[in-house]
């Protein structure tokens, strides 16, 4: 779901007005202002984004996406396994020097994604859909293909010269989150798909080819890639909500599956007999598969909440939490379901427990802060938003809501500091107008010192 509020408040690295105007002027004059060698093809291509900038973009945005997906799983053995498989493949790519990292995130929907600096994640949902280490290698190889072909950087380079957005060009597509889009927008959270790049069909074809190349040269059989494409093609034909975000960012078609089969039988035929490591995959994902029924119920609760079928959603989520009572994602999803119904006290109970289960993760703090604010528990709201800001700094909405809590407490100095910080990042919308009006009212700024 795309909202103007989401666009205005996401913590993207953007061009300054001066940078944008300079680039636009050079482009209109026909000047070649950026050229780099494609690390995959060896050919020169138009490129305005340096490798250092790719890494910076990654570092600034990936943490928000991982938090939106309920953080990296607390199963350290599973994360080590995924990172080991991914790192082995990454060593043989066209850009082995990139700071790659791999993890499984707690999200229940089916997806995997990469940020331009090499931060790569697979959701619990897609991990449960794979049946071999070779299929996992294919999945990670595909995402590595996007990083090595610099697909996001190429999109950014085009956007910098073609989008007339003087305030700056956002790196990634606006939120495509169909689940909780309204809730995320209403309380100022980052939606699940807000920071993910959307790839073209040509991007997907190139990443598929590179993925097969990378995984086979790492010793995996081509059947793993064909398995992955067959699974995705089957899901695409069914089009359940659990994969809506996956196919919004990674266009799927039967052509991709057919191409995988053809490549496996021709160009990569020598790798057909290489191992798939099914048993090794099953052994390393045993703890995850043990709670598969709970994860599926959490996903069902997601979908039902999105459809505003709250009673059925609560039933599904309660069943899931009976199986996995300390599942962070399940607790937060239930909290969101309660929040969507205006049940702030009940929502707070679940978000507070989630915070206890996974104290390093920030999303539960944000929800707890918002619920406490609605319940007029102002000290608690300040504490929760402060905890969130320490774990995941940079979301302007955190500063706005904490400022609002301070305002209600009569602590104008602290409120003014937060409102000022908020206005440095956001200058449109009801929240921005409220912050501005209060700063004027309290005498911190003069009405004519800042254009509204």
Where are these regions (language model features)?
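N-terminal secretory signal peptides
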Residues: 1-19, 26-33
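Register position in tetratricopeptide repeats
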Residues: 306, 340, 374, 408, ...
């Amino acid at each position: 779901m795309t909202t103007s509020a989401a666009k205005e408040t996401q913590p993207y690295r953007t061009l300054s007005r001066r940078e944008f105007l300079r680039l636009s002027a050079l482009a209109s004059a026909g000047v070649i202002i950026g050229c780099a060698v494609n690390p995959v093809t060896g050919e020169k291509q138009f490129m305005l984004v340096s490798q250092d900038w790719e890494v910076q973009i990654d570092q600034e945005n990936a943490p928000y996406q991982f938090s939106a997906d309920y953080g990296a799983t607390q199963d350290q053995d599973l994360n080590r396994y995924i990172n080991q498989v991914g790192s082995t493949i990454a060593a043989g790519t066209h850009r082995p020097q990139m700071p790659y990292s791999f993890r499984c995130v707690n999200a229940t929907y089916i997806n995997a994604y990469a940020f331009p600096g090499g931060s790569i994640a697979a959701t619990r949902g897609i991990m449960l859909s794979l049946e071999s280490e070779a299929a996992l290698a294919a999945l990670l190889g595909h995402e590595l293909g996007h990083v090595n072909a610099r697909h996001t950087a190429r999109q950014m380079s085009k956007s910098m010269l073609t989008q007339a957005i003087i305030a700056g060009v956002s790196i990634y597509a606006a939120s495509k989150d169909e689940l909780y889009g309204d809730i995320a927008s209403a309380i100022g959270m980052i939606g699940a798909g807000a920071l993910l790049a959307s790839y073209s069909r040509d991007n997907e074809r190139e990443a598929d080819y590179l993925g097969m190349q990378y995984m086979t040269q790492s010793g995996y059989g081509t059947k793993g890639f064909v398995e992955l494409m067959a699974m995705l093609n089957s899901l695409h034909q069914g089009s359940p909500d659990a994969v809506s975000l996956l196919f919004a960012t990674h266009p799927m078609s039967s052509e991709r599956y057919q191409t995988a089969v053809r490549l496996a039988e021709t160009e990569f035929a020598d790798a057909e007999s290489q191992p798939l490591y099914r048993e090794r995959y099953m052994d390393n994902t045993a703890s995850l598969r043990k709670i598969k029924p709970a994860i599926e119920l959490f996903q069902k609760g997601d979908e039902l909440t999105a459809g505003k079928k709250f009673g059925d959603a609560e039933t599904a989520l309660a069943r899931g939490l009976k199986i996995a009572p300390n599942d962070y994602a399940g607790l937060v999803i239930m909290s969101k379901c309660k929040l969507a119904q205006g049940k702030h006290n009940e929502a707070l109970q679940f978000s507070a427990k989630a915070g206890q289960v996974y104290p390093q993760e920030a999303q539960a703090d944000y929800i707890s802060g918002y619920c406490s604010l609605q319940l007029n528990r102002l000290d608690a709201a300040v504490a929760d938003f402060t905890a969130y800001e320490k774990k995941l700094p940079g979301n302007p909405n955190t500063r706005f809501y904490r400022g609002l809590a301070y305002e209600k407490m009569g602590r104008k100095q602290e409120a003014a500091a937060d409102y000022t910080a908020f206005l440095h990042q956001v200058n449109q919308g009801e929240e921005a107008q409220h912050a501005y009006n209060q700063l004027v009212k309290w005498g911190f700024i003069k009405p004519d010192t800042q254009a509204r």
